């Protein structure tokens, strides 16, 4: 199975797999059962921003999800990613719908990682930024139902021709270049990621959510991972 570390923006509470009984953000380490969650007031039809930070000195993974009106949610969890992830990874965005649905639209996405080496004082860095997504976006690996180019956005899950969200959909987008996330001689490995998103639904319960994830470089969508598994995990263990 793939090795996944993720920050989930979970719009639908699946209490049977340990979710709190409200929309939340969470940190997932190799399991959809979040290690830490925080209540999140998801604003239907409003553009939000997610900012994710990790620094190997503090070994803390943190995320803030906010809206223009100042409403925000924060979650953090202490984890040594050297012990969890392979040295080379890919970073991506994933989203699903299930019985209930929502649009999982990404308007922008940026990422920066840095490795400061002990021996050479060199910094190995990777940076990318998408302020819009073209129809033929060559530097993204699209999986499942993900498409680019509609209004310059990335649609992670299926929408109809008039933009209505469809159920039982899963899609992911990964940056094409592998990221050197840690190495034994590095003093500090750090990264930060930011994406802006629009979740819109006419359902009384929008579902299921968006996640920023880091995985082994050959990661693919597990079969049956629509809905509560967020396109990341093969089961709810």
Swiss-Prot record:
Keywords per UniProt: Calcium, Lectin, Manganese, Mannose-binding, Metal-binding
Binding sites annotated in the UniProt record for Ca(2+): 10, 12, 14, 19, 208
Chain positions recorded as a carbohydrate binding sites: 12, 14, 99-100, 228
Keyword Manganese: yes
UniProt-listed Gene3D superfamilies: 2.60.120.200
Binding-site list for Mn(2+): 8, 10, 19, 24
GO molecular function: D-mannose binding; metal ion binding
Record SUPFAM superfamilies: Concanavalin A-like lectins/glucanases
InterPro entries: ConA-like_dom_sf, Lectin_LegA_CS, Lectin_legB_Mn/Ca_BS, Legume_lectin_dom, Leguminous_Lectin
Claim: Transferase is one of the keywords in the record: no
Pfam families: Lectin_legB
Similarity remark: Belongs to the leguminous lectin family.
Misc. remarks from the entry: Binds one manganese (or another transition metal) ion and one calcium ion. The metal ions are essential for the saccharide-binding and cell-agglutinating activities.
Subunit structure: Homodimer and homotetramer. Oligomerization is pH-dependent with homotetramers forming at pH 4 and above.
Function: D-mannose/D-glucose-binding lectin. Has anti-inflammatory activity in animal models when applied intravenously. Has antinociceptive activity in mice when applied intravenously.
Designated name of the protein: Lectin alpha chain
Species the sequence originates in: Canavalia boliviana
